[in-house]
Amino acid sequence: MNGSNGEERVVHEVAMVVPKRVLEEEEGDCVEVLVTELRKKGMVVDRVVGLAHEFLKVAAPSEILGNAAAELHIRKPTRLGIDLPFEMQGSEAFIRQPDGLLFSWFERFRCYQHLIYGIVNSGGHDVTLKLDGREFCWTAGESLLRRLESEGVIKQMFPLHDELKRKELLQNWALNWWNCTNQPIDQIYSYFGAKIGVYFSFLGMYTQWLIFPALLGFIVQMVDFGSLQFLALPSFFVGTILWAALFLQFWKRKNAALLARWQINCLVGPSQGYRFLGMEWSSLPFPKELIKNLGNERAKEKEAYQRYEWFAYRKRFRNDVLVIMSIICLQLPFELAYAHIFEIITSDIIKYVLTAIYLLIIQYLTRLGGKVSVKLINREINESVEYRANSLIYKVFGLYFMQTYIGIFYHVLLHRNFMTLRQVLIQRLIISQVFWTLMDGSLPYLKYSYRKYRARTKKKMEDGSSTGKIQIASRVEKEYFKPTYSASIGVELEDGLFDDSLELALQFGMIMMFACAFPLAFALAAVSNVMEIRTNALKLLVTLRRPLPRAAATIGAWLNIWQFLVVMSICTNSALLVCLYDQEGKWKIEPGLAAILIMEHVLLLLKFGLSRLVPEEPAWVRASRVKNVTQAQDMYCKQLLRSISGEFNSLTKPEQEQQQDSERF
């Protein structure tokens, strides 16, 4: 928010959509009351009249955001290396963000929500609000925005793009084709938040690491090794598994380094257990009551924690078993039936018709599975929204895993048709990339164009004019017409990163689990990912609204899914090698086949061994964390000892005075 001359640059970061006024301004107009209350809070409000709605653009100076952060007790890292609740008076002691601002995008949006939703009727009596002849009551102590939302006055509230930073990111990132995988990660984090910043860092690192298996796969696919040809595929298989295991371990190190660089502590905040017990860290007795009650309450607290923990585990386990059994009993027979019918049909026209019917049914089943998963998750006990989102990822990925790979397994294990398998892999890698690129680029733009067209047509009908072109001049109205960055499944828990991460995980599983059948797939994936970085960047900066920030700073459940796919790759590629070398189909344990089985077990051991050999955190991150924890413990212990000493002196001082008085007499 800093201007070029050292003055604070006013940036409208939040917009609210309200109805366009039909009647003349009247006393008690609810929109006027909202604008007045926002300005009383110290915020800057700009009113923009659009075609069918009015827009309130809201900005908050740094001082106002700082006061809100202090009220929210937002913990921030200080220059001493200790995370402390923010206080505006000591703002210079807190570390600033990479873009020079005091608060991250996630923290600023939290402050905006606190300020806007914190407007309550503190007058002690009800207030009558009006809108175009309609009246409703704003009761004492009620949130104004909640009331306006329930009455349909506030249509939407969404974050706005910062035009200056957006254009800078367009030049340095989305349109900078010379840097294939190098991205301004700090700028992405500052503008979009930690979740999107971590995703693009992961995508860039994954694309860079793909260069090695892409070159190796190109050599294996194109070069004839003569008498040593039978060793080419097993060697390539071993190399790709070791590459994948090392990549995931080094990604954990990079993720830890990013969190340390951005001063993000993932462990901040009380756990669900304390909320379950009716306790918060801020409500714990301190310090004399804590010492007195600690021994009495420890047994009860432990018992309550155990009941809560196992009850939550039991509900999650029940839902997971239900989802797995549904996939096995319902989706697996359907996928096998489609693969079998597709294999025996000879007419290409019937195959296309069958595929179209299959895709329609699959879309319905996937959306149905997503809705069922969300309902099951709502009945679980999860510590946060991110835990619920991870639970959704596991359940929905099971559906997509069955859809994507069961037909390929059918071709491999039953028909052993490697030519058909390669054709299927090429088609899915190329067609899926073209499909996802078209969906990412064209679908949001088509939605945006259709909404603009509908608004213009409605305006022409209201004005009664059939000639002349109606222009949309305001930037905020253009952003209002843009679609949101939302997930195709489970929009209550996930945003558009779900679809992007799902696409990447399915691609990784495709090239890894069938690496021996088509080594050139890694090269296709590398080229695809370079395009993916640019298309996703353009999508976020041009065709979509600015996404809502999320607190998560890791790729979450997707890391476990990638590790699962590595283990599956060891098993599937071993099966591919067995099918390739067992040409007679007798499944005899000959020396070659026995060597493949031994290699499979060795690779499984190496995969888990590498996770122990390569530390998940760089040494400097670990040392910095230990230093910060030590400093925090020292300061807390000194404060606790001073408090106990003060209370002890206050208790013993009257006794000493009485003793001195008795000695005098």
From Swiss-Prot:
May act as a calcium-activated chloride channel. Signal peptide: none annotated. It is a multi-pass membrane protein. Belongs to the anoctamin (TC 1.A.17) family. The chain crosses the membrane at residues 200-220, 230-250, 322-342, 344-364, 392-412, 508-528, 551-571, 591-611. The lineage of its organism: Eukaryota, Viridiplantae, Streptophyta, Embryophyta, Tracheophyta. It comes from the Eukaryota. One of its GO terms (cellular component) is chloride channel complex. It is found in: Membrane. The keyword Transmembrane helix applies. Keywords: Calcium, Chloride, Chloride channel, Ion channel, Ion transport, Membrane, Transmembrane, Transmembrane helix, Transport. This is Anoctamin-like protein At1g73020. GO terms for molecular function: chloride channel activity. It comes from Arabidopsis thaliana (Mouse-ear cress). The keyword Transmembrane helix applies.
